[in-house]
């Protein structure tokens, strides 16, 4: 390090000390969590607006923004409303009360919805029409031939399923299911007085929402595929549902309910049974949001507002089709692959491209898995082989979210049926996966597995599998540790990393983790792993503090960290202090970031970037320079209070230099990304990096290409070895 740099770092360290911890923890130096999350959804929306993306990819991104916003209202907004109802006045990390947050959220979400529908109406629908796919937005725009088609479809397919519901003295306002699409109407009796009556019908979720109409051909013989939404067909035929009435007005509407249920786990006699009860209540929680067409009759809106008990700020008048998550169905229509990013095939893992079994390969050395660039198959194979292997004595695994037809579940059940000791922690409290996890828990119990439902007051979010195997030299423990779920479906869509190892100390720690989960054991110390909520916060703070001390001493100091969210005040304050000491900090944070970056005297040494691309960034990676003796960790935890204090999480080290090199390259690419990255500015906004004079770098695309090249090179190497083995030169007689 140059003399000038050491002097500069010393000055910054002095400045940081002068400011003190109070300055680093001042609310003005933090961003509100909810508003930061909304900025993330805006970054996803940017991908929908980006005309360099294939058209159907843009549909997908817009659908994702809508789905994200639904969950945000059902969980985050609902939670804030609960705080207000309870009279909770304590400010958040940024100094905002719950009501202040709700006020800001209302303004920002209304702006976001306008941006969504501007993208939908002005950009995507015209582009679809230009590519031969015409969405007929209003039933009044149908041609006579199309009208006959949809009327026949209504009579034969839709009418038998519908349940029209009137409201009068004997029939109260119906219970409207969470997220259901409905059509509300005001009716007037034929030949009766002028009094208006309210009625509604739910758009049945059991029927497809996108209905294909006959293809039309223009005078130049160009074919157009025509589609219409189911609610338009129902609205066109509303008169058939209320024969003795005239339809004065009718409009689709949709609601979001509070889905953020809480459990008193101490009082629950049976956790599984209690969660099943709460899931039923989720459909009927407080209404958090009402969506209705923007030209809806105000008399109709008044009835809905009164009966659903919705505040004015929670009403969204929508200039287009409700519930844009339907665009994911449109993305799935056949015949449009040319308008999508070509599907990437996850590549084989080079270290496993041989004839040896999984256990032999792990004994050769730790194996790094990088999904979805490399296939998830080795993780499935690990459990399957263990289930069949007569030398395997026990399998233990934690499950948070799994796929609908999970091969992991099938393998665990088979292992139990084969007489092995199988222990599985199924986290029943995984939000919106509770119902699936209850089903899997019952299936595993039926197969003979010992199923644990989790720890009281904590969610088990760690991703760990332990296989205990009898071998010639004694018992050996094989462990898989990951940053992502044991879900073979999302492993093709999410970026995650994992390690397979038989390191004895990691094996000991893995055993201690499962003993902690299944019994009352709390280890006093750990060999290699750091586990929340016991020690993980302390571990991270010590690692950051070490870099701070190195920087103050003029030694090499830097931090590179990748995660989903960053909103822990104690961690952020430590990062601010490190920055003031001269530590270079590069953060890749996909979603929420409550830290302010690039502010002189606070965070001038911190850069934050978010990558939004074809795959969902989900890995957690932490690199600490440590005065030249670099340490690299991966894990399941973000830097959030819930992960560090209220969940069981695991941080694990990467030990092999060869694997460290790969992770460094991985992170270097993400820090060089100038196509899909967004860089946090001092004012809290995000901007795309300046690409002038630079080659375009897309980290996800580059990592795909690297995985393809690595697998190709490994195949070539094996072919050459095979050729050398088969070809034996004839020795000369001389």
Regions found by a protein language model. Give the residues of each.
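N-terminal localization/anchoring segments of enzymes in phospholipid and broader phosphate metabolism
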Residues: 1-559, 577, 581, 593-734
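Hydrophobic alpha/beta core scaffold segments
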Residues: 584-588
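Cofactor-pocket helix-loop regions in the catalytic cores of large enzyme subunits
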Residues: 564
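Glycine/threonine-rich ATP-lid/beta-loop region of ATP-binding domains
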Residues: 569-572, 576
């Amino acid at each position: 390090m140059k003399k000038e740099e050491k002097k500069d770092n010393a000055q910054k360290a002095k400045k940081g000390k002068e400011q003190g911890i109070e300055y680093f923890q001042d609310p003005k130096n933090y961003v509100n969590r909810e508003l930061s999350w909304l900025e993330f959804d805006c970054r996803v929306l940017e991908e929908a607006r980006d005309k360099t993306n294939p058209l159907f990819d843009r549909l997908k991104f817009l659908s994702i923004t809508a789905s994200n916003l639904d969950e945000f209202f059902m969980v985050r907004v609902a939670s804030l409303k609960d705080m207000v109802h309870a009279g909770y006045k304590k400010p958040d990390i940024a100094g905002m009360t719950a009501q202040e947050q709700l006020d800001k959220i209302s303004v920002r979400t209304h702006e976001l919805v306008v941006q969504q529908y501007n993208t939908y109406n002005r950009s995507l629908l015209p582009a679809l029409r230009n590519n031969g796919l015409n969405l007929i937005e209003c039933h009044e725009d149908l041609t006579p031939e199309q009208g006959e088609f949809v009327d026949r479809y209504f009579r034969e397919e839709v009418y038998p399923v519908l349940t029209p519901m009137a409201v009068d003295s004997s029939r109260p306002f119906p219970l409207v299911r969470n997220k259901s699409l409905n059509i509300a109407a005001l009716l007037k009796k034929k030949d009766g007085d002028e009094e208006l009556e309210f009625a509604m019908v739910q758009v049945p979720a059991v029927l497809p929402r996108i209905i294909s109409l006959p293809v039309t051909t223009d005078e130049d013989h160009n074919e157009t595929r025509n589609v219409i939404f189911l609610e338009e067909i129902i609205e066109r035929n509303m008169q058939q549902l209320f024969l003795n009435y005239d339809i004065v007005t009718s409009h689709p509407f949709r609601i979001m309910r509070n889905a953020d249920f809480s459990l008193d786990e101490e009082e629950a006699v049976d956790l599984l049974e209690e969660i099943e009860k709460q899931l039923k209540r989720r459909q009927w929680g407080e209404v958090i949001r009402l969506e209705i067409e923007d030209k809806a009759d105000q008399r109709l809106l008044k009835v809905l507002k009164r009966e659903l008990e919705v505040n004015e700020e929670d009403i969204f008048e929508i200039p287009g089709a409700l519930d844009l998550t339907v665009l994911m169905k449109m993305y799935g229509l056949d015949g449009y692959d040319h308008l999508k990013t070509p599907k990437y095939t996850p590549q084989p893992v080079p270290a496993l491209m041989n004839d040896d079994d999984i256990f032999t390969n792990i004994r050769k050395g730790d194996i790094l898995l990088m999904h979805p660039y490399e296939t998830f198959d080795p993780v499935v194979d690990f459990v399957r082989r263990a289930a069949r292997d007569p030398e395997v004595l026990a399998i233990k695994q934690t499950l948070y979210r799994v796929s609908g037809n999970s091969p992991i579940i099938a393998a665990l059940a088979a292992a139990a049926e084969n007489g092995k000791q199988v222990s599985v922690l199924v986290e029943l409290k995984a939000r919106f996966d509770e119902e699936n996890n209850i089903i899997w828990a019952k299936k595993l119990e039926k197969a003979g597995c010992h199923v644990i439902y989790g720890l009281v007051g904590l969610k088990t979010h760690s991703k760990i599998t332990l296989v205990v195997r009898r071998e010639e030299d004694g018992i050996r423990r094989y462990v898989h540790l990951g940053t992502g779920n044991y879900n073979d479906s999302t492993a093709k869509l999410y970026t995650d990393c994992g390690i397979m190892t038989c390191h004895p100390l990691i094996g000991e720690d893995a055993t201690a983790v499962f003993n902690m989960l299944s019994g009352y054991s709390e280890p006093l110390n750990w060999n290699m792993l750091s586990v929340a909520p016991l020690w993980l916060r302390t571990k991270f703070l010590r690692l950051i503090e070490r870099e701070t001390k190195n920087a103050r001493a003029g030694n090499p100091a830097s931090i590179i960290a990748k995660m989903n969210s960053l909103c822990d005040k104690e961690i952020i304050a430590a990062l601010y202090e490190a920055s003031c000491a001269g530590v270079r900090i590069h953060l890749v944070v996909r979603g929420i970031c409550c830290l302010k970056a690039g502010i002189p005297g606070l965070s001038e040494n911190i850069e934050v970037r978010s990558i939004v691309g074809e795959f969902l960034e989900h890995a957690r990676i932490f690199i600490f320079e440590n005065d030249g003796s670099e340490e690299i960790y991966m894990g399941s935890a973000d830097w959030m209070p819930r992960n560090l204090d209220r969940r069981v999480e695991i941080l694990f080290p990467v030990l092999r230099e060869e694997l460290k090199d790969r992770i460094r390259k991985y992170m270097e690419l993400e820090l060089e990304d100038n196509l899909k990255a967004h860089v946090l500015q001092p004012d809290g906004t995000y901007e795309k990096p300046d690409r002038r004079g630079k080659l375009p770098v897309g980290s996800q695309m580059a990592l795909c290409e690297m995985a393809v090249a690595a697998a190709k090179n490994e195949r070539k190497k094996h072919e050459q070895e095979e050729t050398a083995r088969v070809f034996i030169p004839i020795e000369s007689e001389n």
